[in-house]
């Protein structure tokens, strides 16, 4: 995609310049009248300033349509909201491949500049920002422009399309065994207690706890406290055999919530021990717990480490402790796995919620 600003004495002259440089398939994105200075700034000559765009990738993919509406030609500029008259900085290149935001920001119409600013604040990857802006530009050309009111909605729609489909989100607790795993400090134990409390207090289910976190005494004591508050039994399992015995002990229960050890995600032994202790089967609903405060590269590494373990959904914790959900978006955009829950505080069971793809994107763009 190429975008270029042209200055000419008339629209007819501008159209000729556009055809000459970008070809007949170029589309006018915006136009306005300006005063062109001559003779050392003493004479202001009327002129027009036109922004045109050529989307070669789109043209290659486009298929002919028999009953299609005639496309807007270069003789008729795309209608768009009135943009204030201003001069453009001379350092901005006349023609720019759509890749570097800063290089062409000032030639975008106001609605698209608003979207660009919003994208910059999300923290998502640069390549995603660029592709999203390309799609917005393409839509603006086809739709005859975007307004301040509808540009954010279209932006959110484009971002939603990059995420796993809605049917992979908000999956309710339905299996007998609910297993949470992830790296240390992600908040697994507190999140497990929230899910268990909701299941018991709101769904009136009979619940029990199992923990395989035998590395930290504090973790066992923390879960024991929650179990006592909910008057639910707790079993500590060191081996696969003990886990099987606990399953038999809790055979009459509706849901059994399983806590696991939080270890350094760089340690491959942790994953092996997890699979040795817990037999992942159809009766188990498993969640990979990730902290929203983690860096994208670390989060990506964690997801890769756990790729050998069946993961039904993600749980993202600590969304109240970060100013940007860009890392979360980046992970989801690269994954086929949806989000089961998000947590936003330490209160049990209040600070946990389900979220849809659109709901998450709205959080991202707030």
Curated annotation (Swiss-Prot):
GO terms for cellular component: plasma membrane. SMART domains: SRP54. Residues 64-85 are annotated as: Disordered. GTP binds at residues 182-189, 259-263, 317-320. The keyword Flavoprotein does not apply. Pfam families: FlhF_N (PF22510), SRP54 (PF00448). It is a peripheral membrane protein. It is found in: Cell membrane. Belongs to the GTP-binding SRP family. Necessary for flagellar biosynthesis. May be involved in translocation of the flagellum. This is Flagellar biosynthesis protein FlhF. It comes from Bacillus subtilis (strain 168). The lineage of its organism: Bacteria, Bacillati, Bacillota, Bacilli, Bacillales.
């Amino acid at each position: 995609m190429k975008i270029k600003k042209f200055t000419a004495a008339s629209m007819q002259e501008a159209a000729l310049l556009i055809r000459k440089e970008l070809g007949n398939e170029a589309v006018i994105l915006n136009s306005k009248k300006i005063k062109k200075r001559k003779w050392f700034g003493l004479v202001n000559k009327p002129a027009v300033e036109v922004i045109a765009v050529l989307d070669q990738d789109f043209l290659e993919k486009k298929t002919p349509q028999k009953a299609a509406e005639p496309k807007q030609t270069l003789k008729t500029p795309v209608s768009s909201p009135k943009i204030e008259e201003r001069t453009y900085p001379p350092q901005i290149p006349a023609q720019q491949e759509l890749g570097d935001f800063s290089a062409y920001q000032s030639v975008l119409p106001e609605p698209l500049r608003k979207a660009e600013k919003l994208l910059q604040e999300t923290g998502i990857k640069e390549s995603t920002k660029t592709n999203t802006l390309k799609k917005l530009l393409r839509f603006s050309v086809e739709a005859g422009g975007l307004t301040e009111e509808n540009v954010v909605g279209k932006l959110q729609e484009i971002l939603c399309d990059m995420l796993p489909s809605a049917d992979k989100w908000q999956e309710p607790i339905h299996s007998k065994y609910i297993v949470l795993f992830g790296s240390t400090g992600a908040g697994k134990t507190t999140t497990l207690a929230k899910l268990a409390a909701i299941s018991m207090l709101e769904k009136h289910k009979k619940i029990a706890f199992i923990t395989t976190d035998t590395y930290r005494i504090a973790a066992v004591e923390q879960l024991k406290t929650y179990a006592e508050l909910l008057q639910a039994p707790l079993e500590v399992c060191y081996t696969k055999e003990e886990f099987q015995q606990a399953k038999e002990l809790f055979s009459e229960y509706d849901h059994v919530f399983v806590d696991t050890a939080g270890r350094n995600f760089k340690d491959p032994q942790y994953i092996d021990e997890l699979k040795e202790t817990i037999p992942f089967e159809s009766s188990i609903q498993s969640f990979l717990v990730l902290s929203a405060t983690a860096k994208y590269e670390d989060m990506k590494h964690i997801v890769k480490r756990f790729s050998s373990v069946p993961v039904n959904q993600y749980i993202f914790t600590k969304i109240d402790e970060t100013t940007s959900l860009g890392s979360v978006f980046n992970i989801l955009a690269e994954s086929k796995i949806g989000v089961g829950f998000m947590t936003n505080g330490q209160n049990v069971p209040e600070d946990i919620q389900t979220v849809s793809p659109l709901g998450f994107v709205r959080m991202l763009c707030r």
